[in-house]
Amino acid sequence: MKNKLKSALSFFTTLSNTVKQANKDIDAAKLKLTTEIAAIGVIKTETETTRFYVDYDDLMLSLLKEAAQKMINTCNEYQKRHGKKTLFEIPEV
């Protein structure tokens, strides 16, 4: 019976050490995951910022095209009123 108790004690000591090591490994994994989640958050923020600037540039380009077209149309109308050739011939619709 004494040998069985020693065997049980040995088993539980080994099991306890295994559980302690597992807890350490789990804590280390949690720390790594927390670090990775933070890194992903930074990437997400940078992506959103970049997307904003891309959208902003697209908007600015669109507004620039509209302004340029208005300027060309205004110049063409001015030149037509004064009998000069327009910058770009615009087909009448």
UniProtKB/Swiss-Prot annotation:
InterPro entries: Hemolysin_E. It comes from the Bacteria. Transmembrane segments: none annotated. GO terms for biological process: hemolysis in another organism. Belongs to the hemolysin E family. This is Putative hemolysin E-like protein. The lineage of its organism: Bacteria, Pseudomonadati, Pseudomonadota, Gammaproteobacteria, Enterobacterales.
